[in-house]
Amino acid sequence: MKQAKFIVIEGLEGAGKSTAIQTVLDTLRQAGINEIAQTREPGGTPLAEKMRALVKEEHPGEHLHDMTELLLLYAARVQLVENVIKPALHEGKWVVGDRHDLSSQAYQGGGRQIDATLMKNLRDTALGEFKPAFTLYMDIDPKVGLERARGRGELDRIEKMDISFFERTRQRYLELAKSDASIVTINAEQSIEQVANDIRSALNLWLEQLQD
């Protein structure tokens, strides 16, 4: 197998990312890849976890501005990339991430409707040429996903947004996935078994292409 790669699982709330991540880990190990680090965003370092809390939690009496939210997310992302992901890849460890930059492009760019040029410039400034080698986008109808999320318990600040926010977010996800060959869309509304099969098929095909 060639050098270590960064793989990301993306999707709306309730899309089954945790289960998808486990399928990815199992598939990688079956392919003989055992040196694997896991990350989540926002978070993944002590400082980034503090920023995660600021983004996720309610702030009674003070509105968290959309731009503040966006900058916190990118600040946390830079901490994670520079202190965890890049060092792991350098050591030969594959990295499997629960969310990455695509989340901001979809949630803040799509859901919050922040200017696309600003989003691109911020991404380029913060991350430069760094990007995942392969991304699985778990696609689900927002109404279905939110029902699943509510079943897990109390919703966080972002999960409490109205349905139109998540519809815009999903639309941006789909647009981005369509324009980038490194992003594979998985229908997350299927049975657990079929979703797992689709993930394994997509991941194994990509791994085979790395051998060429």
From Swiss-Prot:
Gene Ontology MF: a single term: dTMP kinase activity
Principal EC category: transferase
Gene Ontology terms: cellular component: cytosol
Keywords, ordered alphabetically: ATP-binding, Kinase, Nucleotide biosynthesis, Nucleotide-binding, Transferase
Catalytic activity, reaction form: dTMP + ATP = dTDP + ADP
InterPro entries, per database record: P-loop_NTPase (IPR027417), Thymidylate_kin-like_dom (IPR039430), Thymidylate_kin_CS (IPR018095), Thymidylate_kinase (IPR018094)
EC identifiers of the protein: 2.7.4.9
Keyword DNA repair: no
An example Gene Ontology biological process: dUDP biosynthetic process
Binding site for ATP: G11, L12, E13, G14, A15, G16, K17, S18
Family: Belongs to the thymidylate kinase family.
Function: Phosphorylation of dTMP to form dTDP in both de novo and salvage pathways of dTTP synthesis.
HAMAP family the record matches: Thymidylate_kinase
Name of the protein in question: Thymidylate kinase
Annotated organism of origin: Vibrio vulnificus (strain YJ016)
Gene (UniProt): tmk
